[in-house]
Amino acid sequence: MRKRTLHKTAAALTALALCAGVLTGCGGAASSTAASSTASSAAASSEVSSEEADELAAKNVADLIDAIYVQERTDDTDAQCAAAKAAWDALTDAQKELVEGEEADPDYFGRDTGDASKDDPRNADDIGENELLVVSFGTSFNASRAADIKGIEDALQAAYPDWSVRRAFTAQIIINHVQARDGEKIDNMQQAMDRAVANGVKNLVVQPTHLMHGAEYDEMNEMLDQYLSLIHI
């Protein structure tokens, strides 16, 4: 009788040990599954956060580009151009592809239009008494600007060596683009006229390169009218 009781007790203890082992295994599996699920969720959240960060960085650049894609120059223009370029340079290649605004796109800074160093903005002082101001609409394509606009200016300088040839663009949008992207500063009409006055120019000949009589041609003449009392034009 005592031997049978011992056998029953041993069997019960063995069963309990097996159940404990099964429960421990189940608990470990559940814990492993929960940890795996948490890791997956964290990875997904990190991926979403990374995508959002990329989009925000690209949108910031797009907003900065749109802010300088304007026809009016202000006291903040130089700083805005510098800020837009710095923000663009800080983007990754993938982020640059996401830049999209009202006017902004990856080509604003990313497109290769030629070597800007081959151009001459002709915005130097020491003009002298006689100035020949070449006024163009302008272009942000570096190779074209160096070949066409600079070509005209160089030809005029060669033909009139006693006159100082200077440049002005009527499209502030283009001036801002070239300045922001290439660091080349080109005078607008007001800057060019103020430069002439500051340099004591007495005789100013204005040579437009516009192909037609449009709004910016009229704006050029309106600007010249403001300086008639200061310079012989």
Question: Predicted regions: what is each one?
Answer:
Residues 163-181:
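Short connector loops at secondary-structure junctions
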Residues 231-233:
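Conserved small/polar residues in nucleotide/adenosyl-binding loops
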Residues 24-25:
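C-terminal motif of bacterial Sec signal peptides marking the signal peptidase cleavage site
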Residues 1-10:
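Bacterial Sec-dependent N-terminal signal peptides
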Residues 182-195:
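Glycine-rich, highly charged phosphate/nucleotide-binding loops
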Residues 31-56, 108-122:
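N-terminal, intrinsically disordered, polar/charged segments of Gram-positive cell-envelope systems
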Residues 48-110:
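Beta-rich interaction/scaffold domains
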Residues 14-21:
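Bacterial N-terminal signal peptides
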